[in-house]
Curated annotation (Swiss-Prot):
Organism listed in the record: Campylobacter jejuni subsp. jejuni serotype O:6 (strain 81116 / NCTC 11828)
Function: Involved in the import of serine and threonine into the cell, with the concomitant import of sodium (symport system).
Listed name of the protein: Serine/threonine transporter SstT
Protein family (similarity comment): Belongs to the dicarboxylate/amino acid:cation symporter (DAACS) (TC 2.A.23) family.
HAMAP family for the chain: Ser_Thr_transp_SstT (MF_01582)
Compartment(s) where it occurs, according to its Swiss-Prot or TrEMBL record: Cell inner membrane
Gene that produces this protein: sstT
Membrane topology: Multi-pass membrane protein
Amino acid sequence: MFSKIIQSYAKGNLIVQICIGIVLGILIGISSKEISEIANLLGILFTSALKAIAPMLVFILILTSICTKDFSQSGAKIKNIIILYIVGTFLASACAVLANFFFPVKLVLDGVQTATNSSPTHMSEIFKDLLFKIVDNPINALSSGNYLGILTWAIAGGIALKHCSNEAKQVFIDINEGVLKIVKFIVKLAPFGIFGLVANSVAQTGAQGLLSYVKLLILLVTTMLFVTFVINALIVFFYTRKNPFPLIFICLRHSAFFAFFTRSSAANIPVNMALCAKLGIDKEFYGISIPLGATINMAGAAVTIAILSLTAANTVGIEISLLQAFLLSIIATFAACGASGVAGGSLLLIPLACSLFNIDYDIAMKVVAIGFIIGVIQDSVETALNSSTDVLFTAICSKNELNYNIK
Protein backbone atom coordinates (compact mmCIF):
# COMPACT_ATOMS: atom_id res chain seq x y z
CA MET A 1 0.00 0.00 0.00
CA PHE A 2 2.75 2.43 1.03
CA SER A 3 4.87 1.55 -2.01
CA LYS A 4 1.89 2.25 -4.29
CA ILE A 5 1.47 5.69 -2.74
CA ILE A 6 5.16 6.45 -3.34
CA GLN A 7 4.94 5.24 -6.95
CA SER A 8 1.81 7.31 -7.54
CA TYR A 9 3.55 10.40 -6.14
CA ALA A 10 6.71 9.78 -8.19
CA LYS A 11 4.68 9.56 -11.40
CA GLY A 12 2.51 12.56 -10.54
CA ASN A 13 2.67 15.99 -12.20
CA LEU A 14 5.13 18.16 -10.25
CA ILE A 15 3.29 21.40 -11.11
CA VAL A 16 0.00 20.06 -9.74
CA GLN A 17 1.75 18.74 -6.64
CA ILE A 18 3.43 22.12 -6.00
CA CYS A 19 0.09 23.92 -6.44
CA ILE A 20 -1.49 21.56 -3.89
CA GLY A 21 1.43 22.22 -1.53
CA ILE A 22 0.97 26.00 -1.89
CA VAL A 23 -2.79 25.83 -1.22
CA LEU A 24 -2.38 23.53 1.79
CA GLY A 25 0.44 25.72 3.10
CA ILE A 26 -1.75 28.84 2.91
CA LEU A 27 -4.62 27.06 4.69
CA ILE A 28 -2.36 25.73 7.48
CA GLY A 29 -0.64 29.11 7.83
CA ILE A 30 -3.97 30.87 8.28
CA SER A 31 -5.51 28.29 10.63
CA SER A 32 -2.70 27.24 12.98
CA LYS A 33 0.59 28.88 13.85
CA GLU A 34 1.69 25.84 15.89
CA ILE A 35 1.22 23.40 13.02
CA SER A 36 2.93 25.89 10.69
CA GLU A 37 6.05 25.82 12.87
CA ILE A 38 6.11 22.03 12.67
CA ALA A 39 5.49 22.12 8.90
CA ASN A 40 8.37 24.57 8.56
CA LEU A 41 10.73 21.67 9.35
CA LEU A 42 9.91 20.33 5.88
CA GLY A 43 10.88 23.68 4.39
CA ILE A 44 14.14 23.75 6.36
CA LEU A 45 14.99 20.20 5.24
CA PHE A 46 14.25 21.12 1.62
CA THR A 47 16.42 24.26 1.62
CA SER A 48 19.19 22.38 3.47
CA ALA A 49 19.17 19.67 0.79
CA LEU A 50 19.43 22.35 -1.91
CA LYS A 51 22.30 24.03 -0.05
CA ALA A 52 24.12 20.71 0.18
CA ILE A 53 23.87 19.70 -3.49
CA ALA A 54 24.11 23.12 -5.20
CA PRO A 55 27.93 23.62 -4.93
CA MET A 56 28.67 20.14 -6.28
CA LEU A 57 26.09 20.62 -9.04
CA VAL A 58 27.64 23.87 -10.26
CA PHE A 59 31.18 22.46 -10.14
CA ILE A 60 30.57 19.20 -12.00
CA LEU A 61 28.07 20.75 -14.43
CA ILE A 62 30.45 23.45 -15.66
CA LEU A 63 33.56 21.23 -15.62
CA THR A 64 31.81 18.52 -17.65
CA SER A 65 30.30 21.03 -20.05
CA ILE A 66 33.68 22.60 -20.86
CA CYS A 67 35.73 19.41 -21.13
CA THR A 68 33.22 17.44 -23.24
CA LYS A 69 31.89 19.99 -25.75
CA ASP A 70 33.77 20.22 -29.05
CA PHE A 71 33.23 23.18 -31.36
CA SER A 72 36.40 22.66 -33.39
CA GLN A 73 34.45 21.41 -36.40
CA SER A 74 31.96 24.28 -36.30
CA GLY A 75 31.47 26.27 -39.45
CA ALA A 76 30.95 30.02 -39.77
CA LYS A 77 27.18 29.72 -39.26
CA ILE A 78 27.61 27.77 -36.03
CA LYS A 79 30.17 30.25 -34.72
CA ASN A 80 27.79 33.10 -35.58
CA ILE A 81 24.88 31.51 -33.76
CA ILE A 82 27.02 30.74 -30.70
CA ILE A 83 27.91 34.44 -30.56
CA LEU A 84 24.24 35.36 -31.06
CA TYR A 85 23.13 32.99 -28.29
CA ILE A 86 25.65 34.51 -25.86
CA VAL A 87 24.86 38.12 -26.87
CA GLY A 88 21.12 37.47 -26.57
CA THR A 89 21.57 35.95 -23.12
CA PHE A 90 23.76 38.86 -21.99
CA LEU A 91 21.21 41.44 -23.20
CA ALA A 92 18.48 39.56 -21.36
CA SER A 93 20.48 39.62 -18.12
CA ALA A 94 21.24 43.33 -18.63
CA CYS A 95 17.50 44.00 -19.08
CA ALA A 96 16.80 42.09 -15.88
CA VAL A 97 19.32 44.21 -13.98
CA LEU A 98 17.76 47.43 -15.30
CA ALA A 99 14.25 46.18 -14.55
CA ASN A 100 15.23 45.53 -10.94
CA PHE A 101 16.75 49.00 -10.60
CA PHE A 102 13.53 50.61 -11.86
CA PHE A 103 11.15 48.25 -10.04
CA PRO A 104 13.00 46.86 -7.00
CA VAL A 105 11.33 44.07 -5.06
CA LYS A 106 11.97 43.21 -1.41
CA LEU A 107 11.00 39.86 0.05
CA VAL A 108 9.76 39.24 3.57
CA LEU A 109 12.19 36.64 4.97
CA ASP A 110 13.04 35.33 8.41
CA GLY A 111 16.61 36.07 9.44
CA VAL A 112 17.20 39.07 7.18
CA GLN A 113 17.63 41.34 10.17
CA THR A 114 20.63 39.22 11.25
CA ALA A 115 22.40 39.63 7.92
CA THR A 116 25.49 41.72 8.56
CA ASN A 117 27.36 41.26 5.28
CA SER A 118 27.93 44.44 3.33
CA SER A 119 28.82 44.87 -0.28
CA PRO A 120 32.09 46.65 -1.18
CA THR A 121 31.52 50.01 -2.83
CA HIS A 122 34.90 51.10 -4.23
CA MET A 123 36.24 49.52 -7.41
CA SER A 124 39.48 48.45 -5.71
CA GLU A 125 37.53 46.73 -2.93
CA ILE A 126 35.29 44.97 -5.45
CA PHE A 127 38.20 43.54 -7.44
CA LYS A 128 40.15 42.66 -4.29
CA ASP A 129 37.14 40.78 -2.95
CA LEU A 130 36.63 39.04 -6.30
CA LEU A 131 40.28 38.00 -6.57
CA PHE A 132 40.38 36.47 -3.09
CA LYS A 133 37.20 34.53 -3.79
CA ILE A 134 38.52 33.35 -7.16
CA VAL A 135 41.77 31.91 -5.73
CA ASP A 136 40.09 30.24 -2.77
CA ASN A 137 41.02 26.63 -2.01
CA PRO A 138 38.67 24.48 -4.15
CA ILE A 139 37.70 22.22 -1.23
CA ASN A 140 36.98 25.26 0.94
CA ALA A 141 35.03 26.86 -1.92
CA LEU A 142 32.80 23.78 -2.19
CA SER A 143 32.28 23.46 1.57
CA SER A 144 31.63 27.17 2.21
CA GLY A 145 29.52 27.84 -0.88
CA ASN A 146 32.03 30.26 -2.48
CA TYR A 147 30.56 30.07 -5.97
CA LEU A 148 33.11 32.35 -7.63
CA GLY A 149 35.85 29.98 -6.44
CA ILE A 150 33.79 26.98 -7.55
CA LEU A 151 33.25 28.56 -10.97
CA THR A 152 36.96 29.35 -11.36
CA TRP A 153 38.16 25.85 -10.49
CA ALA A 154 35.43 24.25 -12.62
CA ILE A 155 36.49 26.30 -15.66
CA ALA A 156 40.18 25.61 -14.99
CA GLY A 157 39.51 21.91 -14.58
CA GLY A 158 37.36 21.79 -17.71
CA ILE A 159 40.05 23.46 -19.82
CA ALA A 160 42.82 21.28 -18.34
CA LEU A 161 40.83 18.11 -19.08
CA LYS A 162 39.76 19.25 -22.56
CA HIS A 163 42.18 16.89 -24.30
CA CYS A 164 41.88 13.91 -21.96
CA SER A 165 40.79 10.52 -23.31
CA ASN A 166 37.19 9.79 -24.24
CA GLU A 167 37.08 7.22 -21.45
CA ALA A 168 38.05 9.89 -18.89
CA LYS A 169 35.46 12.28 -20.30
CA GLN A 170 32.83 9.56 -20.00
CA VAL A 171 33.64 9.28 -16.28
CA PHE A 172 32.80 12.97 -15.81
CA ILE A 173 29.65 12.59 -17.90
CA ASP A 174 28.57 9.68 -15.68
CA ILE A 175 29.32 11.64 -12.50
CA ASN A 176 27.37 14.57 -13.94
CA GLU A 177 24.40 12.28 -14.63
CA GLY A 178 24.59 10.95 -11.07
CA VAL A 179 24.53 14.44 -9.57
CA LEU A 180 21.61 15.40 -11.83
CA LYS A 181 19.65 12.37 -10.61
CA ILE A 182 20.19 13.50 -7.01
CA VAL A 183 19.01 17.01 -7.95
CA LYS A 184 15.91 15.61 -9.66
CA PHE A 185 15.13 13.56 -6.54
CA ILE A 186 15.42 16.66 -4.32
CA VAL A 187 13.30 18.75 -6.69
CA LYS A 188 10.68 15.98 -6.71
CA LEU A 189 10.34 16.60 -2.97
CA ALA A 190 9.72 20.32 -3.59
CA PRO A 191 5.93 20.13 -2.88
CA PHE A 192 6.65 19.10 0.73
CA GLY A 193 9.30 21.79 1.19
CA ILE A 194 7.13 24.45 -0.42
CA PHE A 195 4.18 23.40 1.76
CA GLY A 196 6.30 24.02 4.87
CA LEU A 197 7.77 27.29 3.59
CA VAL A 198 4.41 28.73 2.56
CA ALA A 199 2.73 27.66 5.82
CA ASN A 200 5.47 29.34 7.87
CA SER A 201 5.52 32.44 5.65
CA VAL A 202 1.76 32.95 5.94
CA ALA A 203 1.82 32.31 9.70
CA GLN A 204 4.73 34.73 10.28
CA THR A 205 4.08 37.52 7.77
CA GLY A 206 0.48 37.06 6.64
CA ALA A 207 -0.54 38.32 3.22
CA GLN A 208 2.48 40.67 3.06
CA GLY A 209 4.88 37.77 2.44
CA LEU A 210 2.76 36.28 -0.34
CA LEU A 211 2.29 39.72 -1.92
CA SER A 212 6.07 40.10 -2.23
CA TYR A 213 6.17 36.75 -4.05
CA VAL A 214 3.51 37.95 -6.49
CA LYS A 215 5.42 41.19 -7.14
CA LEU A 216 8.57 39.20 -7.83
CA LEU A 217 6.72 36.89 -10.23
CA ILE A 218 5.21 39.86 -12.09
CA LEU A 219 8.66 41.46 -12.44
CA LEU A 220 10.15 38.20 -13.79
CA VAL A 221 7.37 37.52 -16.30
CA THR A 222 7.21 41.15 -17.48
CA THR A 223 10.97 41.24 -18.05
CA MET A 224 10.86 37.99 -20.02
CA LEU A 225 8.03 39.36 -22.17
CA PHE A 226 10.09 42.53 -22.75
CA VAL A 227 13.02 40.39 -23.89
CA THR A 228 10.71 38.44 -26.21
CA PHE A 229 8.98 41.36 -27.90
CA VAL A 230 11.60 44.13 -27.69
CA ILE A 231 15.14 42.77 -27.31
CA ASN A 232 14.66 39.76 -29.60
CA ALA A 233 12.76 41.91 -32.08
CA LEU A 234 15.63 44.42 -32.20
CA ILE A 235 18.16 41.59 -32.66
CA VAL A 236 16.16 40.12 -35.57
CA PHE A 237 15.71 43.54 -37.19
CA PHE A 238 19.40 44.40 -36.79
CA TYR A 239 20.38 41.05 -38.32
CA THR A 240 17.85 40.92 -41.19
CA ARG A 241 16.59 44.50 -41.68
CA LYS A 242 13.08 43.02 -41.91
CA ASN A 243 9.93 43.16 -39.79
CA PRO A 244 10.76 40.74 -36.94
CA PHE A 245 7.26 40.10 -35.61
CA PRO A 246 5.94 37.57 -38.18
CA LEU A 247 8.87 35.27 -37.34
CA ILE A 248 8.58 35.96 -33.60
CA PHE A 249 4.89 35.03 -33.55
CA ILE A 250 5.57 31.85 -35.53
CA CYS A 251 8.19 30.85 -32.94
CA LEU A 252 5.84 31.67 -30.07
CA ARG A 253 2.92 29.77 -31.59
CA HIS A 254 4.82 26.66 -32.68
CA SER A 255 7.64 26.48 -30.09
CA ALA A 256 6.96 28.59 -26.98
CA PHE A 257 3.45 27.16 -26.56
CA PHE A 258 4.75 23.60 -26.24
CA ALA A 259 7.79 24.60 -24.17
CA PHE A 260 5.51 26.40 -21.69
CA PHE A 261 3.89 23.10 -20.79
CA THR A 262 6.89 20.76 -21.09
CA ARG A 263 9.13 23.15 -19.06
CA SER A 264 12.16 21.59 -20.75
CA SER A 265 14.25 22.98 -23.60
CA ALA A 266 15.68 19.51 -24.18
CA ALA A 267 12.21 17.95 -24.44
CA ASN A 268 11.25 20.65 -26.93
CA ILE A 269 14.15 19.89 -29.31
CA PRO A 270 12.03 17.64 -31.62
CA VAL A 271 9.33 20.34 -31.77
CA ASN A 272 11.90 23.00 -32.68
CA MET A 273 13.52 20.79 -35.32
CA ALA A 274 10.13 20.13 -36.93
CA LEU A 275 9.45 23.89 -36.96
CA CYS A 276 12.86 24.60 -38.55
CA ALA A 277 12.05 22.08 -41.29
CA LYS A 278 8.73 23.84 -41.96
CA LEU A 279 10.54 27.19 -42.12
CA GLY A 280 12.85 25.79 -44.81
CA ILE A 281 16.11 25.89 -42.84
CA ASP A 282 18.95 23.54 -43.82
CA LYS A 283 18.82 20.33 -41.78
CA GLU A 284 22.62 20.24 -41.46
CA PHE A 285 22.46 23.62 -39.73
CA TYR A 286 19.47 23.27 -37.43
CA GLY A 287 20.55 19.73 -36.54
CA ILE A 288 23.46 21.38 -34.69
CA SER A 289 22.07 24.79 -33.72
CA ILE A 290 18.86 23.58 -32.01
CA PRO A 291 20.50 21.08 -29.60
CA LEU A 292 23.25 23.65 -29.04
CA GLY A 293 20.65 26.32 -28.25
CA ALA A 294 18.96 24.01 -25.75
CA THR A 295 22.33 23.91 -23.99
CA ILE A 296 23.67 27.48 -24.05
CA ASN A 297 20.84 29.80 -25.18
CA MET A 298 19.33 30.68 -21.81
CA ALA A 299 17.91 34.21 -21.90
CA GLY A 300 15.07 33.30 -19.54
CA ALA A 301 17.47 31.68 -17.08
CA ALA A 302 19.69 34.79 -17.15
CA VAL A 303 16.66 36.95 -16.30
CA THR A 304 15.77 34.67 -13.38
CA ILE A 305 19.32 34.59 -11.99
CA ALA A 306 19.82 38.37 -12.26
CA ILE A 307 16.45 39.42 -10.83
CA LEU A 308 16.41 36.98 -7.91
CA SER A 309 20.01 37.83 -7.02
CA LEU A 310 19.24 41.55 -6.97
CA THR A 311 16.03 40.86 -5.05
CA ALA A 312 18.14 39.11 -2.41
CA ALA A 313 20.42 42.18 -2.31
CA ASN A 314 17.41 44.50 -1.96
CA THR A 315 16.01 42.34 0.82
CA VAL A 316 19.15 42.59 2.96
CA GLY A 317 19.59 46.29 2.16
CA ILE A 318 22.72 46.08 -0.02
CA GLU A 319 23.18 48.91 -2.53
CA ILE A 320 24.52 47.76 -5.89
CA SER A 321 27.04 49.85 -7.85
CA LEU A 322 27.03 50.12 -11.66
CA LEU A 323 30.22 48.05 -11.85
CA GLN A 324 28.65 45.29 -9.77
CA ALA A 325 25.53 45.42 -11.94
CA PHE A 326 27.69 44.96 -15.05
CA LEU A 327 29.60 42.09 -13.45
CA LEU A 328 26.27 40.51 -12.46
CA SER A 329 25.11 40.65 -16.09
CA ILE A 330 28.24 38.77 -17.15
CA ILE A 331 27.99 36.22 -14.33
CA ALA A 332 24.27 35.66 -15.01
CA THR A 333 25.03 35.11 -18.70
CA PHE A 334 27.58 32.37 -18.18
CA ALA A 335 25.79 30.88 -15.17
CA ALA A 336 22.65 30.60 -17.30
CA CYS A 337 24.60 28.64 -19.90
CA GLY A 338 25.25 26.05 -17.20
CA ALA A 339 21.59 25.78 -16.21
CA SER A 340 20.45 23.58 -19.10
CA GLY A 341 19.14 20.10 -18.51
CA VAL A 342 18.68 20.66 -14.78
CA ALA A 343 15.28 20.87 -13.12
CA GLY A 344 15.26 24.31 -11.51
CA GLY A 345 18.78 24.83 -12.82
CA SER A 346 18.57 28.62 -13.00
CA LEU A 347 17.36 28.78 -9.39
CA LEU A 348 20.21 26.62 -8.11
CA LEU A 349 22.74 28.97 -9.71
CA ILE A 350 21.42 32.05 -7.89
CA PRO A 351 23.91 31.67 -4.98
CA LEU A 352 26.71 32.00 -7.55
CA ALA A 353 25.47 35.48 -8.46
CA CYS A 354 24.64 36.35 -4.84
CA SER A 355 28.25 35.67 -3.85
CA LEU A 356 29.22 38.76 -5.87
CA PHE A 357 27.43 40.88 -3.24
CA ASN A 358 28.58 38.97 -0.12
CA ILE A 359 25.00 37.89 0.53
CA ASP A 360 24.74 35.30 3.28
CA TYR A 361 24.46 31.80 1.82
CA ASP A 362 21.42 30.93 3.97
CA ILE A 363 19.53 33.97 2.69
CA ALA A 364 20.48 33.16 -0.91
CA MET A 365 19.05 29.66 -0.49
CA LYS A 366 15.85 31.05 1.03
CA VAL A 367 15.45 33.10 -2.14
CA VAL A 368 16.05 29.92 -4.15
CA ALA A 369 13.26 28.22 -2.18
CA ILE A 370 10.92 31.12 -2.97
CA GLY A 371 11.93 30.67 -6.60
CA PHE A 372 10.55 27.13 -6.42
CA ILE A 373 7.27 28.49 -5.02
CA ILE A 374 6.75 30.87 -7.96
CA GLY A 375 8.45 28.42 -10.33
CA VAL A 376 5.08 26.95 -11.33
CA ILE A 377 4.71 29.96 -13.65
CA GLN A 378 8.26 31.37 -13.77
CA ASP A 379 9.87 28.16 -15.03
CA SER A 380 7.23 27.71 -17.74
CA VAL A 381 7.67 31.26 -19.07
CA GLU A 382 11.46 30.97 -18.79
CA THR A 383 11.52 27.75 -20.84
CA ALA A 384 9.14 29.20 -23.42
CA LEU A 385 11.51 32.15 -23.93
CA ASN A 386 14.61 29.96 -24.04
CA SER A 387 13.22 27.41 -26.48
CA SER A 388 11.45 29.77 -28.89
CA THR A 389 14.60 31.90 -29.12
CA ASP A 390 16.53 28.82 -30.29
CA VAL A 391 14.38 28.68 -33.44
CA LEU A 392 14.31 32.46 -33.84
CA PHE A 393 18.10 32.83 -33.85
CA THR A 394 18.57 29.68 -35.96
CA ALA A 395 16.22 31.13 -38.58
CA ILE A 396 18.00 34.48 -38.89
CA CYS A 397 21.47 32.90 -38.94
CA SER A 398 20.56 30.30 -41.56
CA LYS A 399 20.42 32.83 -44.42
CA ASN A 400 17.70 30.64 -45.99
CA GLU A 401 14.58 32.04 -47.63
CA LEU A 402 12.08 31.36 -44.87
CA ASN A 403 8.57 29.98 -45.32
CA TYR A 404 6.17 32.09 -43.26
CA ASN A 405 3.04 30.23 -44.40
CA ILE A 406 2.95 27.75 -41.54
CA LYS A 407 -0.36 26.52 -40.16
